[in-house]
Amino acid sequence: MKIVIVGAGRVGYAIAEQLLTEGHDITVVESDPERAAYISSTLDVIVVEGRANVDQLRIANVADADLLIAATTSDETNLISCMVGRKLGATHTI
């Protein structure tokens, strides 16, 4: 599956790590540049650095995603990311 994860703190990172072991293609959207660099160097994922806005979700290719997982610490950001992800074409959102 093609999966986009928004937010790669403790929870998002753990989800990405687990899904990689299951053989999924993962793209991570992370707003913190240091965290994005860390993820890029430790996991075999595509990292899109920036906030989870429409432009960044397009860059993350959400339109082709089977699943978008919003895992930020902000409920508002998670909800909006899922709504935008659906509008852009993500098959499922969490």
Predicted regions located by residue number:
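Cytosolic regulatory regions of ion transport systems
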Residues: M1-I94
